[in-house]
């Protein structure tokens, strides 16, 4: 993988793919890459995201994305090259927003007009 997403055709970049196809069509790596925003020197954001998922899978086989919820145990060292505490916080915030959205009660709308 190249060190920069700028070398990819624009249509193949995760953010552009999300806008064009919707989030359900992106891989877990692509969605994580969007949250991370940038890679690190010599490593693309896709590589960092892929390494993070592999790291979590190694620690919790079968855990997949759910294993990311346990990233809070990170201290000042990097879990994977290019992923420090600030990016871990971004991932945790995104995951917990998703959990809250999934757990939020669905409001029922009362329709008084059958044509509404």
Question: Which residues does each PLM region occupy?
Answer:
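Long, highly charged, low-complexity intrinsically disordered interaction regions
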Residues: 1-80
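Structured, non-catalytic alpha/beta "coupling" segments that mediate domain-domain communication
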Residues: 87-98
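Long, charged amphipathic helices and adjacent flexible linkers at domain junctions
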Residues: 102-116
């Amino acid at each position: 993988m190249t060190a920069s997403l700028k070398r990819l055709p624009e249509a193949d970049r995760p953010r552009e793919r999300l806008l064009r196809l919707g989030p359900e069509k992106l891989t877990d790596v692509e969605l994580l890459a969007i949250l991370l925003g940038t890679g690190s020197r010599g490593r693309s954001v896709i590589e960092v995201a892929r390494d993070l998922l592999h790291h979590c899978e190694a620690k919790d086989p079968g855990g997949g994305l759910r294993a990311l919820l346990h990233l809070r145990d990170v201290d000042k060292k990097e879990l994977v090259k290019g992923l420090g505490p600030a990016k871990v916080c971004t991932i945790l915030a995104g995951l917990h927003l998703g959990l809250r959205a999934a757990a939020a009660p669905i409001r029922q709308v009362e329709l008084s007009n059958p044509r509404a």
